Amino acid sequence: MKKTMFDKIWHQHVITGEPGEPQLIYVDLQLLHEVTSPQAFEGLREKNRQVRRPDRNFATMDHNVPTVDIFNIKDLISKKQIETLAKNTKDFGIRLAGMGSKDQGIVHVIGPQLGLTQPGMVIVCGDSHTATHGAFGSIAFGIGTSEVEHVLATQTIWQTKPKTIGIHVHGKLSIGVYAKDIIMGIIAREGVSFGTGYAVEFYGDTIRNMNMEERMTLCNMVIEGGAKMGSIQPDQTTFDYIADRKYAPGNMEKAVSYWKQFYTDSPDAFDKVIDFSVNELAPFVSWGTNPGMAVPIDQPFPKIKNEEDKKAYEYVGLKAGEKANQIPIKFVFFGSCTNGRLSDLIIAAKVLKNKHIKNGITALVVPGSRKIKEKAEKIGLDKIFKEAGCEWREPGCSACLGMNPDRVPAGIHCASTSNRNFAGRQGAGSRTHLASPAMVAAAAIHGRFIDIRKEII
């Protein structure tokens, strides 16, 4: 019987349970942050339990951290959560990339960056965008706080095995079109619930030609299409990325030999297959209040089909038939676990080099980790951003979500490289428009979205 990569990894991790029912599976790595872990640790204390495998857990601080004056946390709840994580990890013997640590950053950025994320693993975190790690050929998914506690106590989790979707991505991307446009295009076409109840695997020549950071962008946003998990078969690109990282296997040759078993035998093994050609794909921009409400830059916003569309247009202050180049951009955000990596910053910097953002625009550049910030500064990216009028910040989740000081004011349209454009996501009343780093950089210069393909050419 033909099997998917997902089937093979799942089978190796099942401890007990019948097919079709919840099964107890082993967890290779749990990533922790300050927001969804406090109650989990408190639960352990109340039951007088220890962490089963401290070495299989790793924590960082990202959601609430300020990106200016990082040790001066003014919000009392945020400060308490960060202090609590520091105490909990110390008390239970878990590694922590704390405030100011050279390893600190967004949890879904530092996992791969440190070599913690590896093929064939089951990886969990109390955060929905845990699917990012599936880009390495792993099963990775977000869990709730009670499940975080269960994993801490047992290094296992109860899960019902989902069905699988294979998304065949093929063709050659045009200049100015990126991985972000692919996943936004898929969600815009298939809807925000196409993946509900499924684990997604991306495959095809377009995927094979991507670097790891592009692959992570795809898997990161598959959750916005309803899927709990997204993955990509590991290959030499994967192995080369992991080699020599801090927590990479000591014997890479042996590890690679093991990792090579994780592949899908045939597309026939998937429960469902979606075909997606990128040959004619254009840059995408979101117009509404979910990632599926997005259009190619050269197409008008759609007609109102239902009450959800009507409410979305009212919230963002736009009208059906208008185009993305009519959105008055006053705020831009470069960062997040979707597009806050070094290659993303390089792309944005190329657009901004020797240019200046439009007067009246606030532009935040927030590297996904301290290591990325240091690497960017070594090649002069910080100077390019600052000379263009942007603010160069410390690492963190920042303006992706309104849980820290970096918030978009009410009524303001923000061009953002993040992953969600829900009402109030970037701050109460904020209006978020998702796009690639190149598109956001161009919007910062012009004060509106333009077709970056024409700008580059």
UniProtKB/Swiss-Prot annotation:
Q: Where does [4Fe-4S] cluster bind?
A: 337, 397, 400
> Keywords on this record?
4Fe-4S, Amino-acid biosynthesis, Branched-chain amino acid biosynthesis, Iron, Iron-sulfur, Leucine biosynthesis, Lyase, Metal-binding
Pfam families associated with the record: Aconitase
Quote the EC number. 4.2.1.33
Where does this protein have coiled-coil stretches? none
Note accompanying the cofactor annotation: Binds 1 [4Fe-4S] cluster per subunit.
Which BP terms from GO are recorded?
A: L-leucine biosynthetic process
Q: Which GO terms describe its molecular function?
A: 3-isopropylmalate dehydratase activity; 4 iron, 4 sulfur cluster binding; metal ion binding
Give the matching SUPFAM superfamilies. Answer: Aconitase iron-sulfur domain
Which NCBIfam families does this chain map to? leuC, PRK05478.1, PRK12466.1
Q: What does this protein do?
A: Catalyzes the isomerization between 2-isopropylmalate and 3-isopropylmalate, via the formation of 2-isopropylmaleate.
User: Which family does the UniProt entry place this protein in?
Assistant: Belongs to the aconitase/IPM isomerase family. LeuC type 1 subfamily.
Q: What is this protein called?
A: 3-isopropylmalate dehydratase large subunit
Which organism is the protein's source?
A: Oenococcus oeni (strain ATCC BAA-331 / PSU-1)
